[in-house]
């Protein structure tokens, strides 16, 4: 499932799983991440998964790019292997004073406020990762009918 493995500087390896962002690709990234973690390969310093990439940093004194690439190329991921997913409930506040974009969304989506919220809350989302702010989820698979572009000029204060 890895499309390409290349150098990322002199002490990191970049595993590319494709350009798309979807559950299947992300699941493969996480399977490789967990498998490599379990193998405890000498010389690997850090593993960083993303939507569709896996970066592996390593200690050049213990392993080189070619040797590590060969190991990664030969890792076998069993199709039936599954990832233990966790289910999280994320509280969302829809009070008027915090719904700064609702009017813009009503106009853009041509939907009433109630329908926007109803459509949003009727679905479970896939969490691709958490990041920057502790626990900040990167959710995916938002219904096409609810998609809107970002503000041209972001708010300075929220």
Which residues does each predicted region cover?
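Conserved "landmark" site that anchors the functional core of diverse proteins
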Residues: 1-158
